[in-house]
Amino acid sequence: MKAKGFVHKYGDNVDTDVIIPARYLNTANHKELAAHCMEDIDKDFVKKVKTGDIMVGGDNFGCGSSREHAPIAIKESGISCVIASSFARIFYRNSINIGLAILECDEASKKISDNDEVEVDFDNGLIKNITKNETYKAEPFPEFIKKIINSNGLLNSIKNSKG
């Protein structure tokens, strides 16, 4: 599995209340959530993001409230994966459960800049910064997590395995 896109970069401690503000949690409509993704820290995010783009954060990305609305909003906005130095554990699990690819890589988080073009090889854990001609190494997912992400989430993975 690979992803390629331009980077939307944010800092440390990007919490779920910033990813999708609480005032929008009264909807389960994924497109509506995506329409408000990141608006409190990047009002033009929805206008700038293109399908396949990549989000990069710093330490503790996705901290705060335990809500799966946050990774849903990111995924539905068109982001193909999130790279960060570290993730809040509940955000990490929620992301995998809804099929949003995420990778922890401190070096990539620090060296990648906003608007860099990046290609991610999930099978080998390689993050290539095309703009800077640099490659960073992340720990690839084990096979069972790859299966969940490739199935577009945990529920689909379970449905597909029952054949």
From Swiss-Prot:
Pathway: Amino-acid biosynthesis; L-leucine biosynthesis; L-leucine from 3-methyl-2-oxobutanoate: step 2/4
GO molecular function, one term: 3-isopropylmalate dehydratase activity
Biological process according to GO: L-leucine biosynthetic process
Catalytic activity as recorded in UniProt: (2R,3S)-3-isopropylmalate = (2S)-2-isopropylmalate
EC number(s) recorded for this UniProt protein: 4.2.1.33
Annotated keywords: Amino-acid biosynthesis, Branched-chain amino acid biosynthesis, Leucine biosynthesis, Lyase
Domain of life, source organism: Bacteria
Gene3D superfamilies in alphabetical order: Aconitase, domain 4 (3.20.19.10)
Pfam families (UniProt xref): Aconitase_C
Subunit structure: Heterodimer of LeuC and LeuD.
Function statement: Catalyzes the isomerization between 2-isopropylmalate and 3-isopropylmalate, via the formation of 2-isopropylmaleate.
Family: Belongs to the LeuD family. LeuD type 2 subfamily.
PANTHER family noted in UniProt: 3-ISOPROPYLMALATE DEHYDRATASE SMALL SUBUNIT 1 (PTHR43345:SF2), 3-ISOPROPYLMALATE DEHYDRATASE SMALL SUBUNIT 2-RELATED-RELATED (PTHR43345)
Protein name: 3-isopropylmalate dehydratase small subunit
Organism of provenance: Brachyspira hyodysenteriae (strain ATCC 49526 / WA1)
